[in-house]
Amino acid sequence: MTEIKTILSQLVEASHAGTLKRYDKIGETKPYYGVPMGALSKIAKTYINQSDLFVPLWQTGILEAQYLAIQIVKNKPDQLVASDLKSSISKQVSHNILDKLASLILSKRRDSKDWEEYLLTQDQAIFQRLGWFLRAKYFARKTATDQEIEQTLTYIEEHLKTTDPLIQWIMK
């Protein structure tokens, strides 16, 4: 726990007025310290691949601590236990954080297809958006079968206009 306190102190010290102002302007999910991404990356290098820090950092609920948790484990996303990941996906978490989690962690895991299916079955639009993001990544890897592509295109054609705007952009 001392290590988490040290990390949080580093985040407080790295706070920047311009970043705080930007977060306020865009209505970012609080709490946050206003740490620029470059400073976060620099702090993350000290703790790289220490996956045991992911959960305690995430549980602080602090925006930059969650970004940092992602940065620390992004090179070895399969080290994270699925149950820890599942408990970190919450509608209270910043959409930007969840997007980063999907991009840098979920999409690079061996079980990313399972995450796609799980997220697409959730009621919350933000989770479905993450599921569609993972589906797009799957298609981009060119491993989808012709049948999967056809089924997805048919689904998009039938549902695009009535789908939550949060999901529409990814579907397009």
Region locations from a protein language model:
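Alpha-helical scaffold domains
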Residues: 1-172
